[in-house]
Protein backbone atom coordinates (compact mmCIF):
# COMPACT_ATOMS: atom_id res chain seq x y z
CA UNK A 1 0.00 0.00 0.00
CA UNK A 2 1.38 3.40 -0.97
CA UNK A 3 2.66 5.67 1.79
CA UNK A 4 0.17 8.37 0.80
CA UNK A 5 -2.73 6.25 1.98
CA UNK A 6 -1.30 6.08 5.48
CA UNK A 7 -1.23 9.89 5.49
CA UNK A 8 -4.90 9.84 4.47
CA UNK A 9 -5.69 7.72 7.52
CA UNK A 10 -3.72 10.12 9.71
CA UNK A 11 -5.47 13.18 8.26
CA UNK A 12 -8.87 11.61 9.02
CA UNK A 13 -8.19 11.66 12.77
CA UNK A 14 -6.29 14.96 13.06
CA UNK A 15 -9.47 16.93 14.04
CA UNK A 16 -10.02 14.52 16.93
CA UNK A 17 -6.38 14.75 18.01
CA UNK A 18 -6.50 18.56 18.04
CA UNK A 19 -9.96 19.21 19.49
CA UNK A 20 -10.28 16.60 22.23
CA UNK A 21 -9.31 17.20 25.85
CA UNK A 22 -7.46 15.01 28.35
CA UNK A 23 -9.51 12.41 30.21
CA UNK A 24 -9.24 12.78 34.01
CA UNK A 25 -9.13 9.09 34.96
CA UNK A 26 -6.08 7.92 32.97
CA UNK A 27 -4.52 10.59 30.78
CA UNK A 28 -4.23 13.32 33.40
CA UNK A 29 -2.96 10.73 35.86
CA UNK A 30 -0.17 9.75 33.47
CA UNK A 31 0.82 13.40 33.04
CA UNK A 32 0.86 13.84 36.81
CA UNK A 33 3.11 10.78 37.15
CA UNK A 34 5.49 12.15 34.53
CA UNK A 35 5.60 15.58 36.20
CA UNK A 36 6.42 13.91 39.51
CA UNK A 37 9.18 11.83 37.89
CA UNK A 38 10.72 14.87 36.20
CA UNK A 39 10.54 16.88 39.41
CA UNK A 40 12.21 14.15 41.51
CA UNK A 41 14.59 12.86 38.82
CA UNK A 42 13.13 9.35 38.55
CA UNK A 43 13.33 7.49 35.24
CA UNK A 44 12.83 3.81 36.13
CA UNK A 45 10.51 4.13 39.14
CA UNK A 46 7.31 6.16 39.19
CA UNK A 47 5.01 7.58 41.83
CA UNK A 48 1.53 9.08 41.76
CA UNK A 49 0.95 11.77 44.40
CA UNK A 50 3.67 10.19 46.51
CA UNK A 51 2.27 6.66 46.21
CA UNK A 52 4.35 3.96 44.53
CA UNK A 53 3.10 3.35 40.95
CA UNK A 54 4.54 0.18 39.43
CA UNK A 55 1.47 -0.58 37.30
CA UNK A 56 3.13 0.34 34.02
CA UNK A 57 6.68 0.02 32.60
CA UNK A 58 8.63 3.20 31.81
CA UNK A 59 8.69 3.29 27.99
CA UNK A 60 5.44 5.21 27.51
CA UNK A 61 6.30 7.62 30.32
CA UNK A 62 9.65 8.27 28.64
CA UNK A 63 7.80 9.18 25.44
CA UNK A 64 5.59 11.60 27.38
CA UNK A 65 8.75 13.17 28.82
CA UNK A 66 10.20 13.46 25.32
CA UNK A 67 7.04 15.16 24.07
CA UNK A 68 7.15 17.72 26.87
CA UNK A 69 10.80 18.42 26.11
CA UNK A 70 10.03 18.93 22.39
CA UNK A 71 6.84 20.99 22.75
CA UNK A 72 7.62 22.66 26.08
CA UNK A 73 4.20 21.55 27.36
CA UNK A 74 1.76 18.66 27.18
CA UNK A 75 0.43 19.12 23.67
CA UNK A 76 -2.52 16.84 22.88
CA UNK A 77 -1.60 16.46 19.22
CA UNK A 78 2.03 15.66 19.99
CA UNK A 79 1.15 13.16 22.70
CA UNK A 80 -1.47 11.47 20.52
CA UNK A 81 1.17 10.68 17.91
CA UNK A 82 2.58 8.06 20.30
CA UNK A 83 -0.68 6.14 19.87
CA UNK A 84 -1.78 6.85 16.31
CA UNK A 85 1.64 6.32 14.69
CA UNK A 86 2.02 2.83 16.24
CA UNK A 87 -1.52 2.12 15.00
CA UNK A 88 -0.54 3.06 11.44
CA UNK A 89 2.69 1.06 11.71
CA UNK A 90 0.63 -1.93 12.86
CA UNK A 91 -1.49 -1.64 9.71
CA UNK A 92 1.68 -1.37 7.64
CA UNK A 93 3.07 -4.56 9.22
CA UNK A 94 -0.14 -6.46 8.47
CA UNK A 95 -0.10 -5.23 4.86
CA UNK A 96 3.54 -6.21 4.47
CA UNK A 97 2.80 -9.63 5.93
CA UNK A 98 0.10 -10.49 3.36
CA UNK A 99 1.58 -8.56 0.43
CA UNK A 100 2.45 -11.63 -1.65
CA UNK A 101 -0.99 -13.22 -1.25
CA UNK A 102 -3.32 -10.25 -1.75
CA UNK A 103 -4.01 -7.39 -4.14
CA UNK A 104 -3.45 -3.71 -3.33
CA UNK A 105 -7.20 -3.01 -3.33
CA UNK A 106 -7.85 -5.88 -0.94
CA UNK A 107 -5.15 -4.65 1.43
CA UNK A 108 -6.60 -1.12 1.33
CA UNK A 109 -10.07 -2.48 2.13
CA UNK A 110 -8.64 -4.50 5.01
CA UNK A 111 -6.78 -1.45 6.29
CA UNK A 112 -9.97 0.62 6.30
CA UNK A 113 -11.89 -2.14 8.08
CA UNK A 114 -9.23 -2.39 10.78
CA UNK A 115 -8.75 1.36 11.12
CA UNK A 116 -12.48 2.00 11.58
CA UNK A 117 -13.10 -0.83 14.05
CA UNK A 118 -14.06 0.53 17.47
CA UNK A 119 -11.43 -1.14 19.63
CA UNK A 120 -8.56 -0.43 17.24
CA UNK A 121 -9.25 3.22 16.51
CA UNK A 122 -10.25 3.74 20.14
CA UNK A 123 -6.84 2.53 21.30
CA UNK A 124 -5.20 4.63 18.61
CA UNK A 125 -6.80 7.88 19.78
CA UNK A 126 -6.38 7.72 23.55
CA UNK A 127 -3.15 8.44 25.43
CA UNK A 128 -2.30 4.89 26.44
CA UNK A 129 0.45 2.37 25.80
CA UNK A 130 -1.84 -0.32 24.31
CA UNK A 131 -1.17 0.48 20.65
CA UNK A 132 2.55 0.74 21.31
CA UNK A 133 2.52 -2.78 22.74
CA UNK A 134 0.37 -4.00 19.83
CA UNK A 135 2.94 -2.69 17.36
CA UNK A 136 5.84 -4.50 19.05
CA UNK A 137 3.85 -7.75 19.35
CA UNK A 138 3.07 -7.61 15.63
CA UNK A 139 6.73 -6.91 14.83
CA UNK A 140 7.73 -9.93 16.93
CA UNK A 141 5.20 -12.23 15.26
CA UNK A 142 6.06 -11.00 11.77
CA UNK A 143 9.76 -11.57 12.49
CA UNK A 144 8.98 -15.08 13.74
CA UNK A 145 6.93 -15.85 10.63
CA UNK A 146 9.71 -14.63 8.34
CA UNK A 147 12.12 -17.00 10.06
CA UNK A 148 9.61 -19.86 9.90
CA UNK A 149 8.99 -19.34 6.18
CA UNK A 150 12.71 -19.15 5.40
CA UNK A 151 12.69 -15.41 4.59
CA UNK A 152 14.39 -14.24 7.74
CA UNK A 153 17.78 -12.58 8.03
CA UNK A 154 20.54 -13.16 10.60
CA UNK A 155 19.57 -9.97 12.47
CA UNK A 156 16.10 -11.43 13.11
CA UNK A 157 17.59 -13.68 15.80
CA UNK A 158 18.25 -10.49 17.75
CA UNK A 159 15.14 -8.58 16.65
CA UNK A 160 12.64 -11.24 17.79
CA UNK A 161 13.58 -11.12 21.51
CA UNK A 162 14.16 -7.36 21.25
CA UNK A 163 10.61 -6.76 19.99
CA UNK A 164 9.20 -9.00 22.72
CA UNK A 165 11.15 -7.07 25.34
CA UNK A 166 9.88 -3.77 23.92
CA UNK A 167 6.31 -5.12 24.16
CA UNK A 168 6.98 -5.98 27.82
CA UNK A 169 8.63 -2.58 28.31
CA UNK A 170 5.47 -0.97 26.89
CA UNK A 171 2.80 -2.63 29.04
CA UNK A 172 4.14 -5.52 31.05
CA UNK A 173 3.85 -9.34 30.97
CA UNK A 174 1.10 -9.52 28.34
CA UNK A 175 3.72 -8.34 25.85
CA UNK A 176 5.58 -11.56 26.60
CA UNK A 177 2.65 -13.94 26.94
CA UNK A 178 0.83 -13.10 23.69
CA UNK A 179 3.71 -13.61 21.20
CA UNK A 180 5.09 -16.70 22.99
CA UNK A 181 1.71 -18.46 23.15
CA UNK A 182 0.91 -17.42 19.57
CA UNK A 183 4.16 -18.93 18.30
CA UNK A 184 3.59 -22.14 20.28
CA UNK A 185 0.00 -22.54 19.07
CA UNK A 186 1.03 -21.84 15.46
CA UNK A 187 3.74 -24.52 15.61
CA UNK A 188 1.32 -26.89 17.32
CA UNK A 189 -1.20 -26.46 14.49
CA UNK A 190 1.62 -27.02 11.99
CA UNK A 191 2.61 -30.18 13.94
CA UNK A 192 6.08 -28.71 14.34
CA UNK A 193 6.10 -27.65 17.99
CA UNK A 194 9.47 -29.35 18.57
CA UNK A 195 11.10 -26.70 16.41
CA UNK A 196 10.16 -23.93 18.86
CA UNK A 197 13.70 -23.75 20.24
CA UNK A 198 14.96 -23.17 16.70
CA UNK A 199 13.17 -19.82 16.71
CA UNK A 200 13.38 -19.01 20.40
CA UNK A 201 16.36 -20.88 21.78
CA UNK A 202 18.99 -20.14 24.38
CA UNK A 203 20.33 -17.13 22.44
CA UNK A 204 16.92 -15.46 22.20
CA UNK A 205 16.19 -16.22 25.87
CA UNK A 206 19.59 -14.77 26.78
CA UNK A 207 18.96 -11.54 24.87
CA UNK A 208 15.50 -11.14 26.41
CA UNK A 209 16.82 -11.90 29.90
CA UNK A 210 19.69 -9.45 29.41
CA UNK A 211 17.38 -6.57 28.53
CA UNK A 212 15.12 -7.41 31.49
CA UNK A 213 18.12 -7.60 33.82
CA UNK A 214 19.26 -4.10 32.80
CA UNK A 215 15.73 -2.77 33.40
CA UNK A 216 15.43 -4.48 36.80
CA UNK A 217 18.87 -3.23 37.82
CA UNK A 218 17.80 0.33 37.01
CA UNK A 219 14.69 -0.16 39.15
CA UNK A 220 16.69 -1.59 42.05
CA UNK A 221 19.27 1.19 41.99
CA UNK A 222 16.58 3.87 41.86
CA UNK A 223 13.72 2.43 43.92
CA UNK A 224 15.21 -0.42 45.92
CA UNK A 225 13.86 -3.90 46.58
CA UNK A 226 10.40 -2.65 47.61
CA UNK A 227 9.62 -1.22 44.17
CA UNK A 228 11.14 -4.22 42.38
CA UNK A 229 9.12 -6.65 44.51
CA UNK A 230 5.94 -4.70 43.76
CA UNK A 231 6.64 -4.81 40.03
CA UNK A 232 7.62 -8.49 39.80
CA UNK A 233 5.18 -10.01 42.27
CA UNK A 234 2.29 -7.69 43.11
CA UNK A 235 1.81 -6.35 39.58
CA UNK A 236 2.54 -9.66 37.82
CA UNK A 237 1.92 -12.81 39.84
CA UNK A 238 -0.71 -11.47 42.25
CA UNK A 239 -2.59 -9.70 39.45
CA UNK A 240 -2.64 -12.90 37.39
CA UNK A 241 -4.00 -14.93 40.33
CA UNK A 242 -6.37 -12.35 41.84
CA UNK A 243 -6.75 -9.32 39.62
CA UNK A 244 -7.44 -6.12 41.52
CA UNK A 245 -8.47 -4.27 38.33
CA UNK A 246 -10.85 -6.75 36.66
CA UNK A 247 -13.01 -8.43 39.28
CA UNK A 248 -15.83 -9.75 37.10
CA UNK A 249 -16.30 -13.48 36.54
CA UNK A 250 -14.68 -14.88 33.38
CA UNK A 251 -18.02 -15.36 31.59
CA UNK A 252 -18.75 -11.62 31.93
CA UNK A 253 -15.85 -10.83 29.60
CA UNK A 254 -16.87 -13.55 27.14
CA UNK A 255 -20.35 -12.07 26.80
CA UNK A 256 -19.05 -8.48 26.74
CA UNK A 257 -16.49 -9.10 23.99
What is the predicted function of each stretch?
Residues 1-257:
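Membrane-integral, polyisoprenol-dependent glycosyltransferases
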